[in-house]
UniProtKB/Swiss-Prot annotation:
Encoding gene (name): atpI1
One of the protein's GO biological processes: vacuolar acidification
Keywords assigned by UniProt, alphabetized: Cell membrane, Hydrogen ion transport, Ion transport, Membrane, Transmembrane, Transmembrane helix, Transport
Source organism per UniProt: Treponema pallidum (strain Nichols)
Functional note: Produces ATP from ADP in the presence of a proton gradient across the membrane.
Protein name per UniProt: V-type ATP synthase subunit I 1
Membrane topology label: Multi-pass membrane protein
Compartment list: Cell membrane
Molecular function GO labels: ATPase binding; proton-transporting ATPase activity, rotational mechanism
TM segment ranges: 306-326, 328-348, 373-393, 428-448, 459-479, 485-505, 532-552, 562-582
UniProt keyword Signal present: no
């Protein structure tokens, strides 16, 4: 359920802002309505947090010796603050980057000078001061033969059609008569031999900095703790900046101005009494009212332990219903489990998930830790997958004739591998379409409950009629035309449903105004019939993805079966595990794409759920 909220406005003395905010944070139940704000302190906190992220990224691959979770760590016998460690890590990395650039430059100079042998550029510069300019030049042999006679050259080497020579000139710079393909050597500041020495020194310095950076790997715990503190400081600063100060009056005796600061937020109704006691204790003034539809009210979901199993998936997706919308967590959990089982469609895969989840639960209990809802969700999904896989008699893609009789007796003949393939597929598609009809009708029934006192409820009854008619149309097209004919009653239900939906879907004040609003969007209204057909048809994806996964499992078994008859049995086991593991991962991705979509798109559209909610994040100690 969505927890009801109250909008609260808090008023405090301007001189008591920080103390009041600390008390409000200790209370820990008010979701503060933040404003767009900026300050120098906030910018510094964000910059420090960015440096912490950079520092963790720099040392995360280093070998961690002793991860310390305090605010201080010891490296090389010296205790330093975590913030100082961050600065040292960033500075060390900056020095490494600078050294890497110098090493790259040194290597580039060596590569250019290597064909010219060892020489001392200082001698060349000394001769240039005496008026003798030596210019190392590389050019093609043909261009070398065509050099003018007035150019004095000394040929050093001929290799690969290239000539390396030295031009002797009485002034600096390349002569204008030199061919276009001639390239002069850029002289380094020292000799190649000295470059080698410099390169070795730079690499040693870089290795030293690398070891120093590796030593900071034990700071990761401290830096993460520092990030948590920074996050709390950022939140406090943003709330502080969101408080609006107003000058109320001025004392005649002292001339001091009385300033009042106020901030707004949202509070669960169940905490209003506790907030009132806190306000009385802290001498606050406050106003507590019901939120308006235009207010950005946060959404807090509170469900029982069973429905709360879906929370890991909802947190992963980041989907939150709006405060004024409906919570479908229970229906989401129920149908997501069914869709999961049909997409996996393998009792063996379900057994693996069940055993892994049970192992996680047992391990958590042995450690006296709280069992994560993710393990319970895995147990629920694995159990449903085992049930559906047993009904269709699919155990790791093994042909039904090799399945033990005790397991084969569990199967439902019409939808299992014992039936004819064509008929089995039609029956399974029929099951998927029926689930789709049930799923979408349930969505409209939820809306019926919310709009029962309004004529708009007739639009939902019209949608139900269209869904029923389109369900038969889909069965006629996909499953069996003779068994599911398109009678006049079916067509009439679709038309009647469309008329009811068209007239009352925009009902607010009067039927006439509702029809007028529908006429403005008549094209979208007509396309709505197609959308209903597409939504029912969309549930065929459950059968299609499950069929594909079963085919992959069977193919993997057929490919590896011959290997078990000879000495390649070990290779067969490896390929079997790899193939089924890959299929398992692909099935998980299919669930995320298809199983989640049917809940968050098709079902949500029929409920009128837009997932535009703001997660309830109270201002509290972290």
């Amino acid at each position: 359920m969505i927890v009801p909220m109250k909008k609260v406005t808090l008023l405090v003395l301007g001189s008591e802002q920080e103390r009041s905010l600390q008390a409000l944070r200790s209370f820990g139940a008010v979701h503060v309505q933040l404003r767009e704000c900026a300050s120098e302190q906030l910018a510094e906190l964000h910059a420090l947090d960015a440096r912490c992220v950079q520092a963790i990224a720099l040392v995360t691959d280093a070998q961690t010796k002793n991860v310390t979770r305090g605010e201080e760590c010891r490296v090389a016998g010296q205790v330093v603050e975590a913030a100082e460690a961050v600065e040292q890590i960033v500075r060390t990395h900056s020095d490494r980057v600078e050294l890497a650039q110098r090493i790259a430059q040194c290597i580039a100079h060596l590569e250019r000078c290597e064909p010219w042998g060892d020489f001392d550029p200082a001698d060349v510069r000394a001769l240039a001061q005496r008026g003798i300019h030596l210019i190392p030049v590389e050019l093609s042999e043909r261009s070398y033969r065509c050099l003018p006679d007035e150019l004095q050259t000394l040929c050093l080497a001929r290799r690969g059609g290239l000539v390396r020579c030295v031009l002797v000139a009485d002034k600096p710079g390349l002569p204008p008569s030199l061919p276009a393909d001639a390239r002069a050597l850029e002289l380094p500041d020292v000799s190649p031999a000295d470059l080698f020495v410099r390169l070795r020194q730079l690499r040693e310095e870089c290795a030293t900095l690398t070891q120093r950076l590796l030593a900071y790997s034990e700071y990761q715990g401290a830096i993460r703790a520092l990030r948590q503190k920074i996050a709390a400081d950022i939140e406090f600063e943003r709330v502080h900046l969101s408080m609006v100060s107003v000058d109320v009056s001025q004392w005649r005796e002292t001339g001091e101005t009385l300033r009042i600061a106020h901030v707004s937020g949202y509070l669960p109704v169940s905490r209003v009494r506790a907030f009132s006691e806190c306000a009385r204790k802290e001498a606050w003034a406050y106003c507590c009212v019901d939120p308006m539809p235009e207010d950005p009210v946060p959404t807090q979901l509170r469900n029982n332990r069973w429905v709360n199993l879906i929370s890991p998936l909802m947190n992963f997706l980041g989907t939150v219903p709006g405060y004024w919308e409906v919570d479908i967590s229970g229906f989401f959990l129920l149908f997501f489990g069914v869709f999961f089982s049909i997409i996996f469609a393998d009792a063996g895969y379900g057994a693996v998930l069940t055993l892994v989840s049970l192992g996680g639960i047992v391990l958590s209990k042995r450690k006296h830790a709280v069992v994560s809802p993710a393990w319970c969700l895995g147990l629920y999904l694995g159990t449903l997958t085992m049930v559906w896989g047993a009904l269709v008699c699919n155990w790791f893609g093994v042909p039904v004739q090799y399945v033990p009789a005790s397991l084969a007796r569990i199967a439902v003949w019409e939808i299992s591998g014992f039936a004819d393939a064509a008929q089995r597929n039609k029956n399974q598609m029929h099951v998927c379409f029926f689930l789709g009809l049930l799923h979408l009708c349930l969505g409209h029934l939820i809306v019926v409950r919310r709009t029962f006192r309004s004529l708009r409820v007739l639009a939902e009854f019209g949608s139900l009629l269209m869904l029923g008619g389109m369900y038969v149309v889909v069965l006629n097209l996909i499953v069996d035309k003779e068994r599911y004919p398109l009678t006049g009653m079916i067509v009439g239900s679709i038309i009647a449903g469309f008329v009811l939906n068209f007239i009352f879907v925009n009902y607010r004040v009067s039927v006439r105004q509702s029809v007028a609003d529908s006429m403005k969007n008549v094209i979208n209204a007509l396309l709505g019939i197609v959308n209903v057909f597409a939504d029912v048809m969309s549930y065929i994806r459950l059968w299609a993805v499950g069929l594909a996964g079963g085919a992959i499992s069977a193919t993997v078994n057929e490919m590896t079966h011959p290997l078990f008859a000879n000495f390649l049995a070990f290779l067969g086991i490896v390929l079997l595990l790899f193939g089924h593991g890959l299929n398992y991962v692909m099935s998980i991705l299919s669930v995320i794409v298809h199983g989640v979509r049917l809940n968050t798109l098709e079902f949500s559209n029929h409920v009128g759920l837009m997932w535009t909610g703001i997660r309830y994040t109270p201002f509290r100690e972290r």
